[in-house]
Each structure stands twice: as structure tokens, then as C-alpha cells.
Amino acid sequence: MPRVFLVVMDSVGIGGAPDADKYFNGEISDFGSNTVLHIAQYMEKLGRPLKLPQLNSLGLGSAIFHSVGIEHPDLPVSNNANWAVGRETSKGKDTPSGHWEIAGLPVTWDWHYFTEKTNSFPKEIIKSICEISGVNGILGNKHASGIEIIEEFGQLHVETSMPICYTSADSVFQIAAHETAFGLDRLYELCEKLSPMIHSLNIGRVIARPFLGSKDEGWRRTKNRKDYAMVPPSPVLIDWVKAAGRKTYSIGKIGDIFSMRNIDFNVKGSDADLMQKLEEHT
């Protein structure tokens, strides 16, 4: 009986979509983006070839050439592989949009975004966070990188218990909190209770971003991230597989992205741990 292993390599891009010029990272346009090809070109300048023999044997170089019409010696075109290039039709470039479309549900609507770079969140959201967590306020309230904002507010968070709240160019509301000083279960409870309000604004995800450490030792994010995503409004691949009487397994954040609907087994961990789990099922 056939099985399918669908692996999404996050941010391993092989060329921008036709509408890439409409999307940005900060002030930088996504037009011309091609992560794998650009890495190969950079490594070539350093005199250190990019070695991806397994991926090339599966057709990576062929896919890149088809995508952008550029062939690189470290990404050779293969005549003995089955490959394809997908062109996303969903409007967003966020995680739910891409994963849902891969699973058969293109996102044809516009997500809402917190566009203000500072003071990003409405007072109603901040009030709800305070009521749920019993705190006097929040930290952050801006666009930020997860690592940088923990460095900026980690110590004050530990001292005050005020959660660190931030967003990005994606349709997300992220909350970082110390696993012991604030409490992991408390963070999960906050995100779970807050998510209906956030989803009602058409924001795709609330993300719990737990971390550990101290000011002296440094801060580190843990593997206990949890995404509270909107429920897919229509059936997706996982639902069809389940309806056919088969078992479904998810690793990493996939279960969260699909709201655990029709997921039989869900495994989380580091990237290495997750790949080991994948190998155990091959």
C-alpha cells in the first residue's frame, strides 16, 4: 500500500513567484529572490562549492533551471529525476497560505496584518492579554525579530512577568515568555484564550514562543513553540487521507498549522530529532 512523505523545507526557495514584486521583507522587495541559487553563487565566490548530491539527484537543479532559466555548475540539470515547480496562487506569503495551498486549499482572501512598526496592537488586545494573564501591561508591541526582542526585553520580562508581544511582515501575533519565570502552561493558556480574538481580526496565527536562560547566561528559545492557527475553512489533503481510512503523521509545526484536524500522531522537537522521526517511518 503506497505511502507519501511530504517534507517542506522552510525558506529553501528556488525562485520568486510572478507577483514577488508586491511583497517585501522590511523595505526590500522579494523580486529576484532565489535562496538556493544565491547561496550556490555566493559559495562559488568563496571557492567552496555547494554540495547537494542527494537533492540534485532528486532534480533540484532541474527545478531551479525551469523556475528561473539559470543553470549553476553546483546545481546540475538531471535527466533521471522526477521533479516539478509549483507556482503559488494564494495571496499571502505566510506559513498557513503556503502550507494550506500545498494541501489543496489556496488562500484566495487577504489576511489582516499589523502594519504599524511600533505601537502595533489595538488597546483591546493589550487589555485582553492583561486580563487573561493578570499582568499590568505588555512588552514589545512592535515589529521585531524573535531573537532580538528577547535580548531586548528578556530581563524586564523576568522581573515583571509582562509578556513580550511582537509581530512581523506575516499575519501573526507572537508572544514570548520565559518557561519557568512566566510558566510554559501559562503561556499556552494565554495564547489559546487570546487566539479567538486575534483570529476574528483575520490574523492567521497566534504563536507561543517560549524561551529559557538569563541575562548573564544568555537567552535561548526552546523547542516548545506552539502555533494557534485558524482552522482551514475547507477540507485539505489530511482530511482526504483520513477519509480514505489511512493514518496521518505530522512533525514539527504542521499539526498546529492545520489545527490538529484529523492528525493521528504529532511529533515535535529539534530539526535533527524530527528528521530522525521521519527516518523511522521510512
What is each PLM-predicted segment?
Residues 1-282:
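…; additionally, a secondary subgroup of soluble metalloenzymes is captured
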